[in-house]
Amino acid sequence: MKKIDRRKAIKNLTIGLGGATLLSSPLSGFAHTKNNSKTIPSREFGNPNIENPVTVITLGAGGRGNVYGNYGIQFPKELDIVGVAEPISIRNERYTKKHNISEENRFDTWEHVFDRPKFADAVIISTPDNLHYGPCMKALEMGYDVLLEKPIAPSEKECLDILNLANKTGRIVAVCHVLRYAPYFIKLREMIQSGSIGKLISIQHLEPIEHIHMSHSYVRGNWHNSKKTTPIILAKSCHDLDILRWMIGKPCKSIAAYGSLKWFKKENAPEGSTNRCSDGCAVEATCPYSALKIYNDPNGWSSVFDLPDD
């Protein structure tokens, strides 16, 4: 059976991991339609037919870093995690043990990874949104291919810098817009492009963020303040913007956006509420956003925490 080269394997692997490639030049392994949109080649997961797995360093061993790491556990012939950079010690230790990473390839910050000569094929960047730009630019400079969590970066300039450097170096930057690979959206795009449901005039789109997810991520969580991290239109709805553009298949002529904080404000707090749910809040028992219920339930959101094994 014919073996495929590792460069092509990396390009194909980004599809399995859910990456939309950020390169202006066509990539081998993709078919192109008349409007130059890329279609997904069929492939069997777990059977890449390469001599050695693609070696990868994970920058950020949180939820997303572990999702991609688990792919390596499930398909070790495709992906081998050989390094990790993670400042939270319990995450670093668990990820190192899980993937049998050598001590010399453990780092407490992404910068230290690049103090070493290149020692893997690619890096997975699953750091917080405002820590995408630095490691991505450095990885490209050193010749790594990159699997980059969405959004690409907080600013237009940073996004363009990454695009330009990817083109200059010829390296792969695969952005994790995973909805492009969901059967639902693939079929919907096919119907729109074929005209089988008629001519597209307008789209009414709703991002239905579930209420607990909303309170966890965008009220209490890492994205609670748009001045400290990316706003919700990037942190969450970059998926929506990408999938709409992809399904329509035409460039945007103009964009307008507006928004503000409406509900989670002090003046809307119910009578008897406290700063924290655990401070004797009078309405905690009936509150749909109660942290005590959300995080104490073993079948709920407790999995988002790095709890000790005991």
Residue ranges and their predicted role:
Residues 65-68, 132:
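N-terminal Rossmann-fold NAD(P) dinucleotide-binding loop
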Residues 78-96:
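NAD(P)-binding Rossmann-fold cofactor-contacting core
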Residues 83, 122, 202:
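Short, Asp-centered acidic motifs that coordinate Mg2+ and/or phosphate
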